[in-house]
Amino acid sequence: MAEGIKAGFIGCGNMGGVLAGVAAKALGGDSVYVFDKHPEKTEKLSLNYGCNKAWAAEILEKCGIIVLGVKPQALPDLLEKIKEPLTRRTDRFTVVSMAAGVKTSAIEAALGEVPVIRIMPNTPCASGEGVILCSKGSFAGDEDLNAVLKMFEPAGKLLTVPESKIDAGCAVSGCGPAFVYMFIDALIDGGVRAGLTRAEATLLAEQTVLGSAKYAIQTGAEPAKLKADVCSPKGATIEGVAVLEEYSMRSAVMEAVKAAYERTVELGK
Ligand SMILES: NC(=O)c1ccc[n+]([C@@H]2O[C@H](COP(=O)([O-])OP(=O)(O)OC[C@H]3O[C@@H](n4cnc5c(N)ncnc54)[C@H](OP(=O)(O)O)[C@@H]3O)[C@@H](O)[C@H]2O)c1
């Protein structure tokens, strides 16, 4: 990464805010500039990570990496506003978009021949155990991609994929945290129903999901095999598994991913 690079974030809500924090860990807060319509959001980033509160104009003028963190519906309007200030730049800069479904070609059509990196992050990036999928636009080079990857290194796992796969990835890792939280929440309620306090059930449920994922990663074994390993004949676990099958848990999750994928594609139209 070019020494002394500055990164700017326009739109610092749930996801943009998390990624500004990640960038501050990698680059130092004094190299990160943040702007949002709601000043309280950037105030928090300034207090927590030492990021600089800035105006969009300042970010567009001096940041080498410009991250757009607004909702897909708000992106066309933002692109329209930033086009002119960006044409005045004579140095190299990279535009990063995290907007679900929006193709790099659409951003290039709005901004011209500028280097664009499209990413698909998730909120667990805040804990250092997130996932960010990355794809290069037509005018972005390896140097642009590498600078973005380096800046997001503290987020967790970073995967460069062809852009044709990013919407499917979004349905799994971008939307997946909500599905996993629903599962944890249900596991907690089940524990309370069986007699645990909510605090006890929460600790057990969260640690079980965390440990199961870690163990699957460590062993590299198929989750189906790991499930079979803990189901003893006529045991308690297989009884629970049978109920999940009866209530179509697996097909419900597969349908949820399909619906999220279809909606992601639709958001880009
Ligand atoms: N949340 C996730 O888990 C997740 C995961 C992967 C990708 N993403 C992507 O991340 C992007 C942001 O999602 P989010 O959930 O973080 O949304 P969010 O919480 O609503 O954050 C967006 C922020 O940007 C502000 N904003 C809108 N237009 C602006 C402008 N022109 N200048 C400055 N600030 C502006 C919004 O203000 P207003 O609310 O007043 O409009 C809001 O504070 C989306 O494109 C989404 O597809 C999100």
Regions found by a protein language model. Give the residues of each.
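NAD(P)+-binding Rossmann beta1-loop-alpha1 motif at the extreme N-terminus of oxidoreductases
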Residues: 1-57, 61, 130, 192-194
